[in-house]
Amino acid sequence: MKAVTATNATTAEDLNQRGLDLLAGGAAPEAAEAFRAAIAVDCAHIEAHHGLVRALRDAGRLEQSIAAALALTALTPADPLAHTALSISLQRAGHVPQAEAAAARARVLEWKIQLQSPPEQAGPGESLQNLSLPIQGTVP
């Protein structure tokens, strides 16, 4: 298979897409190289960082996946998905306490995002009033 470099595809997005295609095709080691090439072109390409974490994990390179996930959390410290990716890699590598801590951090970040979101337009109880559930069977 042809080596993935910045000369084979000119943009980080092209390289990222190549990595996604390789990952979907089961070629995790090659996908990792494509994601690394995308990051070399644009170090702030968040999707490529996420892809690299996944590709390394799928390739069984768990410690490298953890390192890539830590780099991602440093790049995007308020991103719950980055902390979730770190948690998954840590868990797969057997670092359960650290995985649980990363998962807890992801939950806290998600809650913060939810709290900053505008409340729903419906008043209290309105969402339940409009809820319709299919009734199965009959009630005696």
Indicate residue ranges for each PLM-predicted region.
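Structural signature of tandem alpha-helical TPR/SEL1-like repeats
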Residues: G25-A37, A59-A71, A93-R105
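Alpha-helical segment of the N-proximal tetratricopeptide repeat
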Residues: A9-V41
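TPR-adjacent "capping" and linker segments in tetratricopeptide-repeat scaffold/adaptor proteins
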Residues: M1-D14, V139
